[in-house]
Amino acid sequence: ILHQGPRADLRKYSSDDRSETARRLTNLFQPPKPIEIEGRFFEEGLIHRTARGEMVRSKSEVIIADHLHTRGLDYSYERKLTIDGTTKYPDFTVEDMESGLTVYWEHCGMLHVPSYRRRWEDKLAWYRAHDILPHEEGGGDRGALVVTQDETNGGIDSERITLLLDRLFS
């Protein structure tokens, strides 16, 4: 790729809303539910826009993405992670080139819903089985897992996100 200008300008082209392939609505198990935003079509759940211009599923994810972006961290939203033939899509993947640390960030916004909680517990067990351990435990050989969640009233504590990022990337 030949590019004139700062490398950071290329990041905007790595987000899903710039990818024609990622924007294809090709779920084999249920019909797509596209919505139109500014003349472009997105899957129904991706309705919140971050400061970086990507579409995410919740306002809490917007806050997290904007914090990552403000710090200049190179992150991906819902990047495919395949280990031993099983694929997961962490909410955020942050690769810190300076430290070599890979952080998989999951935000749990609906733990009060029993089916959501069960899926999350299964996903957490999968992470543990594949040596992606919570950052509070020092992480694992394949990366560190950061888990945040909404408050019981549905809110999110932005200051807590800031403090967490200070501990992880300072």
Indicate where each model-derived feature is located.
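A cross-domain feature marking catalytic cores of carbohydrate-active enzymes
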Residues: 79, 107, 149
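Basic, glycine-rich
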Residues: 132-170
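Short beta-strand-loop-alpha-helix junction that forms the active-site gateway
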Residues: 89-125
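Class I S-adenosyl-L-methionine
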Residues: 68-69, 124, 128
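Active-site metal-binding core of divalent-cation-utilizing nuclease and nuclease-like domains
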Residues: 56, 67-69, 73-99
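Acidic-and-aromatic substrate-binding clefts and catalytic sites of carbohydrate-active enzymes
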Residues: 81-87, 113-114, 150-157
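Solvent-exposed, charged helical/coil patches
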Residues: 2-76
